[in-house]
Curated annotation (Swiss-Prot):
Keyword Iron (UniProt): yes
Lineage, top ranks: Eukaryota, Metazoa, Chordata, Craniata, Vertebrata
Protein location: Cytoplasm; Lysosome; Cytoplasmic vesicle, Autophagosome
Gene3D superfamilies per UniProt: 1.20.1260.10
Keyword list, A-Z: Acetylation, Cytoplasm, Cytoplasmic vesicle, Host-virus interaction, Iron, Iron storage, Lysosome, Metal-binding, Oxidoreductase, Phosphoprotein
InterPro entries tied to this protein: Ferritin (IPR001519), Ferritin-like (IPR012347), Ferritin-like_diiron (IPR009040), Ferritin-like_SF (IPR009078), Ferritin_CS (IPR014034), Ferritin_DPS_dom (IPR008331)
GO annotation, biological process: intracellular iron ion homeostasis; iron ion transport; negative regulation of ferroptosis
Keyword Iron: yes
Gene this chain is encoded by: FTH1
Chain positions found as Phosphoserine: S179
A single GO cellular-component term on record: cytoplasm
Reaction equations catalysed: 4 Fe(2+) + O2 + 4 H(+) = 4 Fe(3+) + 2 H2O
Protein name: Ferritin heavy chain
Family under the similarity heading: Belongs to the ferritin family.
Length: 181
C-alpha cells in the first residue's frame, strides 16, 4: 500500500530539489552500475587484472553508497523517493584499463557537474542544509576522484598503454596493487 500523505517533517525543501535529488540518485546508481560492469570485466579469466577489478568494485560500492546517502536525505527532509530505470552501461567489453579509466573519468565528471547544478538549485531555493550536505559529503570527494583518475590515465599513457600490454599488467600490480592493505 502506498500513501501520498504530505510529510509532517518537510520544511524548506522545494519540490525542484526533491526531483533533482531523485535524478542524482539515479545518476549515482548508474555510475555504480558502470563501475560494477568494469570490475567484472577485469575479473574475467581472459583479462585477469585483479587490481583493476578491485579498484572498480570499490568505486561501484562508493557510488551505491552515495545513492543511499541521498535516499536517507530524502526521507530525513520529508521528501519522497521515486526510483527510475538505471541505464545500461554503454558497453560490456571495456577493451583495456586505459579505456575503462577514461570512461570512468567521463562518468565522475558528469556526476560532479550534476552535483554542482544541484548545489546551485539549493542556493537558488535558499536551502542551506542541502548546500552544506552536498559540500560536506560529495564535492570534495568528487574532485579527489577526478584527480585520481586523471593521474591514473596519465600514468597509463606514460607507460605506453594500451599499445604496450605489459603497461597494464605493471600498473595493475604496482599502482593499483600497492593500495592493498
Amino acid at each position: 500500500m502506498t500513501t501520498s500523505c504530505s510529510s509532517q517533517v518537510r520544511q524548506n525543501y522545494h519540490q525542484d530539489s526533491e526531483a533533482a535529488i531523485n535524478r542524482q540518485i539515479n545518476l549515482e546508481l548508474y555510475a555504480s552500475y558502470v563501475y560494477l560492469s568494469m570490475s567484472y570485466y577485469f575479473d574475467r579469466d581472459d583479462v585477469a587484472l585483479k587490481n583493476f577489478a578491485k579498484y572498480f568494485l570499490h568505486q561501484s560500492h562508493g557510488g551505491r553508497g552515495h545513492a543511499e546517502k541521498l535516499m536517507k536525505l530524502q526521507t530525513q527532509r520529508g521528501a519522497r523517493i521515486f526510483l527510475q530505470d538505471i541505464m545500461k552501461p554503454e558497453r560490456d567489453d571495456w577493451e583495456n584499463g586505459l579505456t575503462a579509466m577514461e570512461f570512468a573519468l567521463h562518468v565522475v565528471k558528469n556526476v560532479y557537474q550534476s552535483l554542482l547544478e544541484l548545489h546551485k538549485l539549493a542556493t537558488d531555493k535558499n536551502d542551506p542544509h542541502l548546500c552544506d550536505f552536498i559540500e560536506t559529503h560529495y564535492l570534495h570527494e568528487q574532485v579527489k576522484a577526478i584527480k585520481e583518475l586523471g593521474d591514473h590515465i596519465t600514468n597509463l599513457h606514460r607507460m605506453g598503454a594500451p599499445e604496450y600490454g605489459m603497461a597494464e599488467y605493471l600498473f595493475d600490480k604496482h599502482t593499483l596493487g600497492s593500495s592493498e592493505s
